[in-house]
Amino acid sequence: MHGRGYANGLKTFGLMVGLSALIVFAGAMFRNTTILVVAILLAVGMNAWAYFNSDRIALRAMHALPVSELEAPVMYRIVRELATAARQPMPRLYISPTNAPNAFATGRNPRHAAVCCTSGILQILDERELRAVLGHELSHVYNRDILISSIAGALAAVVSGLANLAFFAGAFGGRGNGEGPSMLGVLLVSLLGPIAATLVKLAVSRSREYEADRSGAELTGDPLALASALRKLERGTQAAPLPPEPQLTAQSHLMIANPFRAGERAARLFSTHPPMAERIARLEEMAGGRSGGYR
């Protein structure tokens, strides 16, 4: 299990290096380093704001409401037990009043974390499955995945920004004074840069989902319960998907399961989530073939 975690971490690091290399390549198209510096500062600034406000943005998009222990005693008990086992602070708990079954965690660190379940997921999971899902979400917080996704987003935004600058610099002049990019550079950066950056950013998201599955199952000691929950969520999100609205699609990477109906999102390469079958297979491998009462 620890070998799988090391591999996930190494993959994430490699993807970050790839994004950084894209920035270097895109920036090399310009002889004026001011352009590169401005693009980096803008991207880092925007993503820093998103990082510090990630909880409010996500909770508002899902119309999530804070709940007390009297309103959600089972959810509180499970999260408190898991947080205590992990020696981490108790996060704030929310419920989103939607039938679409899903859950997510947000917040820049364990002391500013929030965990949200939809009404739909609370209706379809038994307590053991809910515990497994909450373990997965808490693992996102403990693994600092909001920070990782913010860094990936910032790097991808730099590449996209440089691509736009390259396009306009190439289209409207600047080559003759020795400060603009070559036409070949314009084509390469403006066409391929954003696509490559997006693919790498999504690959980071998928890698972190695998790691949250692994470490969440390790926290609860029940990988088969998470596998069972994912099976139910795969069916449930197809029967009751979220509407593909911009504010919801922007938060879809936070969800434990892709919240949109198949066919409304891009193909596997452009997905924020790994294939359910692969996630379930890995969890069953962790369980070592034990049935645990789940199929």
UniProtKB/Swiss-Prot annotation:
Residues where Zn(2+) binds: H136, H140, E209
UniProt xrefs under HAMAP family: Pept_M48_protease_HtpX
Pfam families given in the database record: Peptidase_M48
Gene Ontology cellular component list: plasma membrane
Lineage of producing organism: Bacteria, Bacillati, Actinomycetota, Actinomycetes, Mycobacteriales
Cofactor binding notes: Binds 1 zinc ion per subunit.
Keyword Hydrolase attributed: yes
GO molecular function: metalloendopeptidase activity; zinc ion binding
Protein family (similarity comment): Belongs to the peptidase M48B family.
Membrane topology label: Multi-pass membrane protein
Keyword Transmembrane helix carried by entry: yes
GO BP, sorted A to Z: proteolysis
Active-site positions on this chain: E137
Subcellular location: Cell membrane
Entry cofactors: Zn(2+)
Alphabetical UniProt keywords: Cell membrane, Hydrolase, Membrane, Metal-binding, Metalloprotease, Protease, Transmembrane, Transmembrane helix, Zinc
Transmembrane feature ranges: 10-30, 32-52, 151-171, 184-204
Protein name in the entry: Protease HtpX homolog
Cited CDD domains: M48B_HtpX_like
Entry EC no(s): 3.4.24.-
Main localization, broad class: membrane
Signal peptide bounds: none
